[in-house]
Amino acid sequence: MARQKMFYNKLLGMLSVGFGFAWALENITIYEFDFGKGILDQSYGGVFSNNGPSQVQLRDAVLMNGTVVYDSNGAWDSSALEEWLQGQKKVSIEKIFENIGPSAVYPSISPGVVIASPSQTHPDYFYQWIRDSALTINSIVSHSAGPAIETLLQYLNVSFHLQRSNNTLGAGIGYTNDTVALGDPKWNVDNTAFTEDWGRPQNDGPALRSIAILKIIDYIKQSGTDLGAKYPFQSTADIFDDIVRWDLRFIIDHWNSSGFDLWEEVNGMHFFTLLVQLSAVDKSLSYFNASERSSPFVEELRQTRRDISKFLVDPANGFINGKYNYIVGTPMIADTLRSGLDISTLLAANTVHDAPSASHLPFDINDPAVLNTLHHLMLHMRSIYPINDSSKNATGIALGRYPEDVYDGYGFGEGNPWVLATCTASTTLYQLIYRHISEQHDLVVPMNNDCSNAFWSELVFSNLTTLGNDEGYLILEFNTPAFNQTIQKIFQLADSFLVKLKAHVGTDGELSEQFNKYTGFMQGAQHLTWSYTSFWDAYQIRQEVLQSL
């Protein structure tokens, strides 16, 4: 039977939602593929039958740790949350800039250096990581109405010099054409090499730095900033050729080489690393196209983009595995040491798909594999973290890095929820909403029973009957009542993760790396820059959603 597109206007029955009222089921489209019977056939018993009112509902959530998230009539108690969000945003931005040199609070930090944390003992995080620094700078450029240009230029200057510095992996560029030394993840705050044993190389750093610097280049062009003669680059072309190009060369040369993951624990091939490498290459090709620059380097980049894309989506490489309906973060340890679930997969999706221009890249925010990864992280971590025990199934919870984590922020014992993981869940859902609203896209809900609709059936809707093994989809057309109420539900789910975080943040707004899974109190490295950055990311995309509604 050929593919059919069926519109059901004023379909028999009503769609009852958990907001104290019901609206007629109008402008809902069901795409059907090769069904033997129409879904309105009583004998089929599909999701929308003519046996009476449909019982598909939006899930309701009432209490979380004693805090009203929204009541049974859907009334959102947002005043306390809104007040806290505003205050926490202010604290987060202040703390981020305190952790960037030159800092009045930490004067030993060199200009342009972004420290991971001011903590120097138990644990010692008083270093600069290429990854953390790049993610922080990326957020500053993305979210600030007028980012501190001197901070950005100082960061570029640090990047320029680190690339040309020797480290334990090898000689810096300029001494050799080999880029292997760019895989060193960690440096001292005075820009000297960190020479102790560590998990090297980490191949995501150059990619993340490229992404951040390409965004700086765009800002400099748009703002007409005069670079002057203070630094070793006088134009955006210099910045690209002298910094970004070397990081891209590293990706071309080493993308298919093993390295340590972003948690610095496992040496192998990782979803996070590969997806951000793909993004860096893709954004660089956009740079060449926009600047109308030609280079033989471009064809190498195109081939690398093709190669990484193919590698990521090839089932043989294990990131997409028929056994699971979520993304496997590091396939080499799935099934043996871990489940493969990892918050880093959502971090990667959010980092890469922060704008519609990246929608052609795989694993976009609305990809069922991405959304189901969030669902499964919630499913696992709801039970392993006692502070989540009182949370309803359809509300946000405290999330950690991966279910098998044993790092407690000081040593090895029992893993805890992380601030950045919990904020990433919110960011993912806000991104999902923003994408559909800003681009006026319909909501597409998978209706097959191969578990690809787990996010929708377990977190958003109840009684969402599947349509068999064929690929059927429920389409909620943009700006219809069905669409709007579902978007509201997803927004409330996104907010509920921040409500959960709020319950464990002190009055001073300090964000450490983790919060204890039993007591809920902050622990691990204090004033973690990545924690503040992750909150800022969630806050900012939330504001963009509110402005677009």
Curated annotation (Swiss-Prot):
This is Glucoamylase, intracellular sporulation-specific. SUPFAM superfamilies: Six-hairpin glycosidases (SSF48208). GO terms for cellular component: fungal-type vacuole; prospore membrane. One of its GO terms (biological process) is glycogen catabolic process. The gene is SGA1. Keywords: Carbohydrate metabolism, Glycosidase, Hydrolase, Polysaccharide degradation, Sporulation. The active site is at 261 (proton acceptor), 264 (proton donor). Belongs to the glycosyl hydrolase 15 family. Substrate binds at residue 198. It catalyses: Hydrolysis of terminal (1->4)-linked alpha-D-glucose residues successively from non-reducing ends of the chains with release of beta-D-glucose. It comes from the Eukaryota. The keyword Hydrolase applies. The keyword Hydrolase applies.
